[in-house]
Design a protein with these regions (language model features):
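Σ70-family region 2.3-2.4 aromatic/basic alpha-helix that recognizes the −10 promoter
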Residues: 35, 43, 57-64, 74-95
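N-terminal module of bacterial RNA polymerase sigma factors
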Residues: 1-37, 123, 140, 187, ...
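Arg/Lys-rich amphipathic alpha helix in sigma70-family domain 2
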Residues: 65-69, 83-104, 180, 191
Length: 197
């Protein structure tokens, strides 16, 4: 693991060095390598594809502007980039919580789009999407600290150490938040009658 991490750190440092020198291909490689992960994280916090896309773009603008601050001695590129992403996404989430907007029309349009999607089993796809939406609604009800840890561990599949590095909190705190978040999510889903209890 140490050798793999060292290799990842060296590769990330080299990509950043090339970007700083004006190599567009290096920047494109960074974006292609990490954009899906950033988008997934943004989507888990926003539950909206358009907002997640906007946040993903914002993250990469910030990353590009912050390349001079990247120091491979403090961790690999992925951890640094995902820490920037997490901070920006959490900040956006907090702003939206303070100033909620009426998004019913947008949600209705999304629903119409999903109903038009074709497939062999429309019913099964609708059930899968509904279950996914219900689970996401349950995740949205968790406190920010619990939600962040649950998303990073159970959805983004980061290791405990990666979460520790990303959030800069002790491993015991990470494990506690994940456990409490899972328990709370199960209670929420039972109340929503998503799972039997």
């Amino acid at each position: 693991m140490g050798a793999a991490r060292s290799l990842a750190t060296n590769e990330g440092a080299e990509l950043v060095r090339r970007c700083r020198a004006g190599d567009g291909a290096a920047w494109e490689e960074i974006v292609q390598t990490y954009s899906r992960r950033v988008y997934n994280l943004a989507y888990r916090f926003t539950s909206r594809a358009d907002t997640a896309e906007d946040l993903t773009q914002d993250v990469f603008v910030r990353v590009y502007r912050s390349l001079e601050q990247y120091n491979p001695k403090q961790g690999d590129l992925q951890n640094w980039l995902m820490r920037l992403a997490r901070n920006l996404i959490i900040d956006d989430y907090r702003k939206r919580q303070r100033a909620p907007q009426d998004e019913i029309a947008d949600d209705l349009e999304d629903h119409k789009y999903h109903l038009r999607s074709a497939g062999n089993s429309v019913q099964r796809e609708m059930e899968r999407r509904e279950l996914g939406a219900q689970v996401q609604a349950g995740i949205d009800k968790l406190s920010a600290d619990l939600r962040t840890c649950v998303i990073l561990r159970d959805i983004e599949e980061l290791s405990y150490q990666e979460i520790v590095d990303l959030l800069r909190i002790p491993e015991g705190t990470v494990k506690s938040r994940i456990n409490r978040g899972r328990i709370e999510l199960a209670k929420i889903l039972r109340r929503m009658r998503v799972v039997e209890g």
